[in-house]
């Protein structure tokens, strides 16, 4: 898979794309109670944070996760407005190279 460093989503574009995918698929993958909780609390405590892919993704996929091209976006709620997300609703793995659309999601169980 040939990828171009100059053809990547920015960090903001990556966060936005992951959040859009989350919103589109949440109803099919989360409990209704979780969706209500997320929607009620997101304004005050919700967020999406960008990370290099965690090592445990290798249990779910079978290719190299070069952090130059792949990012993990954690979507959920924090205890405080500026706190770290500790109530995770989804972990979204995205390829940031614009010509390689790839997305995997680990949903809250």
UniProtKB/Swiss-Prot annotation:
SUPFAM superfamilies linked to this entry: Putative dsDNA mimic
InterPro entries per UniProt: dsDNA_mimic_put, Put_dsDNA_mimic_sf
Known function: May act as a double-stranded DNA (dsDNA) mimic. Probably regulates the activity of a dsDNA-binding protein.
Entry's family note: Belongs to the putative dsDNA mimic protein family.
HAMAP family recorded: Put_dsDNA_mimic (MF_00680)
Protein name: Putative double-stranded DNA mimic protein YciU
Organism: Salmonella typhimurium (strain LT2 / SGSC1412 / ATCC 700720)
Gene that encodes the chain: yciU
């Amino acid at each position: 898979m040939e990828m171009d460093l100059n053809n990547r989503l920015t960090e903001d574009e990556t966060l936005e794309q992951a959040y859009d995918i989350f919103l589109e698929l949440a109803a099919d993958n989360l409990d209704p109670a979780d969706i209500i909780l997320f929607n009620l609390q997101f304004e005050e405590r919700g967020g999406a944070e960008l990370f290099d892919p965690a090592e445990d993704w290798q249990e779910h996929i079978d290719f190299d996760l070069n952090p130059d091209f792949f990012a993990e976006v954690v979507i959920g709620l924090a205890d405080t407005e500026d706190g770290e997300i500790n109530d995770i609703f989804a972990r979204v793995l995205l390829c940031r190279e614009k010509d390689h659309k790839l997305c995997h999601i680990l949903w809250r169980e």
